Amino acid sequence: MPCEASHGTHEYYRWRGLFSRRLIQEHGFTWIGVEGDWPDCWRINRWVRGSGDQDLDVYGLLARFERWPTWMWANQDVAEFLAWLREWNLARPAGERVGFYGLDVYSLWDSLREIISWLEANAPDAVPDAMRAWRCFGPYLEDPHEYARSTRLVPESCEADVVALLVEVRRRARLRADDEEAFDAAQNAEVAADAEHYYRIMVRGDRESWNIRDHHMADTIDRLAHHLGPRSKGLVWEHNSHVGDARATDMARDGLVNVGQLVRERHAADGVALVGFASHRGSVLAAGAWGTPESVLPVPDARAGSHEDFLHRALGRPAVLVFGHDRAGPWLSAWLGHRAIGVVYQPIRESRNYVPTRMGDRYDALIWFEQTEALRPLHHEPPPREPEFETEPTGF
């Protein structure tokens, strides 16, 4: 599970892509799950595997990412990796092609649209169930914030309708177990149900929304592994805050879990490797506030006494650090700050970006850079009318 210490650093994306290429080429990894929306990434999955939107090049494909922050996936490094992955796949039989899937929970309305489309083509008698859920959400004009706010004032919600839809789509999809589009529809139903729960809890300021989101991503990993079979091997691309084991940070004190912790707990016997990234200084692509346009921002030298400061003084050059079985050494077992930069970054508040971390328990390996540069976005989008609410911890 190679992760990243920011959502806007060229070296993290570039080297994660190179690392993933080698694992695919040399060790037979068969799918990639990312911190992105399921419907958007399903279009990418079809494209890299040789079906759907084949008239588009990779830049046209990524231009369809519209939800802020678009630069997380619509950037030059992702474009180069996906172009390589498609070329790799098309040289192989259909059954040996590597998939690309979104793990996140945010695509409520897009997922509902995909469910309705699939039911219309495959189970028209079930369309009324989907339309009932759609009509419940209809008054909120595809604005999850309006829906979430309404549940604070009136206890009624769309929970019952969306859960009933999930049960029905699951049942229909099981009848077509080998059908990729049925699996897509079932996963969209899982997204819709969890997204409704996520927004309803988040608007109350409850940090449990973080756990709902990370449980959804871990559950999606499990569903992918089951669907793709026991011989499948998966890579997970997410932020350090999701992949680095929460039990080795102060998140555990606040009752928060994350994907890395859940996958370790569920699949330790199957072989799980959590790989972090870190750097000393450089620049990053991020926004100054939630929902605003991105810009290139400076990343100052690591804070004194942090893990990054220690690595800068001890190494002074890029390195790959693989932690062995004995992790009781003074650095690996020390509680020090570990920098985490999200999609929102304010260098003047740099001290807020350090998470108390026991490095040897949080990761199995760490890729270290002295100097980094900002990602190159493929396009610049104006901010949406109203962006997604921030999660807690913020910015990830």
Q: PLM features: residue spans?
A:
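Structured catalytic-domain cores with a bias toward divalent-metal coordination
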Residues: 1-396
